Amino acid sequence: MSKKPIVLKLGKDAFGDQAWGELEKIADVITIPESTTREQFLREVKDPQNKLSQVQVITRTARSVKNTGRFDEELALALPSSVVAVCHTGAGYDQIDVEPFKKRHIQVANVPDLVSNATADTHVFLLLGALRNFGIGNRRLIEGNWPEAGPACGSPFGYDPEGKTVGILGLGRIGRCILERLKPFGFENFIYHNRHQLPSEEEHGCEYVGFEEFLKRSDIVSVNVPLNHNTHHLINAETIEKMKDGVVIVNTARGAVIDEQAMTDALRSGKIRSAGLDVFEYEPKISKELLSMSQVLGLPHMGTHSVETRKKMEELVVENAKNVILTGKVLTIVPELQNEDWPNESKPLV
């Protein structure tokens, strides 16, 4: 068995070489081939002759799901008893079912704070673009419709921020960053809906309303909730029908929070006037009909796709792994495990 604790690094990073180099001074960092399948992975972590069966800390990126599949109950049960922590490179961790890891006393960590600014910037870009029909104008410009199609390439008029009610679905870290970024543009009316009302000092002047009222009052629906069994298809045909005619929807959270077919139908009918989307329900597979709609301003999940943010995320994942080795505990344990006693009983690996 290795003298150093074994850290399994799943997925590639872009800016973390220096941090990983430092970790290798105290850990044996191993990887798996790019061609690895879930079946191979599940088989090899159970093989006592394979180094994977001795792993103690796992780090993972979202893209590594192509090799391992979801971190679900089957995978959690297959992992060797030596595993004490899974460290995910992202704020959203819907690829991980926390409960089976909780049952095995395996800590799960994410990177909750570092993505807020970059994601909020992306959200505001999409919101303003969808409100002003910039996506339509961009498409028509590229298609060569100017000047023949008239002013603005014949794009429909957009709308200004004044007088519009922005409904923030999920006023958490990212939601508050979006709120503060929107105020200088002239937005004045903000409402929000969370499962529970926040303390007034955390509301930043945003009015708490019930879900039904939220749907009825919002001119713009800003989606910022994590994806879980409670929020899957939270926006669906029934809830869309309760929204204002001509509502604008912006989503930089997770695609499956919205029933994509219901949204597509509503865009086609005009119930939803436009949408700004950085995430999609079945990404990277995207509905051809949705992509063909000029009123959809879409991005290929670029919310945290900046040098500075990505570097910080990758470095924090390494810090989580390092902290497990030196103290037994991750730095940023996910909310579902924050009230558990057993992580505090974890021992250093060296």
From Swiss-Prot:
The lineage of its organism: Eukaryota, Fungi, Dikarya, Ascomycota, Saccharomycotina. Keywords: Cytoplasm, Mitochondrion, NAD, Nucleus, Oxidoreductase, Phosphoprotein. This is Glyoxylate reductase 1. The modification Phosphothreonine is found at residue 31. Disruption phenotype: Leads to higher biomass concentration after diauxic shift. Belongs to the D-isomer specific 2-hydroxyacid dehydrogenase family. GO terms for biological process: glyoxylate catabolic process. It comes from Saccharomyces cerevisiae (strain ATCC 204508 / S288c). NAD(+) binds at residues 173-174, 252-254, 278, 301-304.
